[in-house]
């Protein structure tokens, strides 16, 4: 698992995909800390798995998964400068990121 992953190079994306690394995207934390916006749509189109997280209280003033999902959608629209996003970033795509069973299962095994 890779947390945040805001500035991945094409080589990084290749390595992540080759080794099955998935990204945990924390949009509220990234906004709160002014870290930037991860190009989630590009990562999904490249075949990477992306989950949504809320990060911790030190870098986020609330732990609200629905707010994180909503902000992820809005930030991806802003960075794409386009309201209709790809199927990866529509409401169902964002819900899949929030509830990816394969990834959740691997986290449970690691804990």
Indicate where each model-derived feature is located:
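Active-site core of metal-dependent hydrolases
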Residues: 1-62, 80
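His/Asp/Glu-enriched, well-ordered alpha-helical/loop segment
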Residues: 41-111
């Amino acid at each position: 698992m890779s947390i945040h992953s805001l500035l991945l190079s094409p080589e990084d994306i290749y390595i992540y995909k080759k080794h099955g690394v998935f990204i945990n995207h924390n949009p509220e934390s990234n906004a709160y800390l002014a870290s930037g916006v991860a190009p989630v749509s590009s990562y999904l189109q490249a075949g990477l798995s992306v989950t949504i997280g809320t990060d911790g209280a030190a870098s986020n003033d609330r732990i609200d998964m629905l707010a994180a999902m909503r902000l992820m959608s809005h930030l991806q629209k802003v960075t794409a400068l386009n309201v209709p996003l790809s199927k990866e970033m529509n409401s169902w795509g964002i819900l899949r990121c929030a509830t990816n069973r394969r990834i959740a299962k691997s986290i449970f095994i690691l804990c």
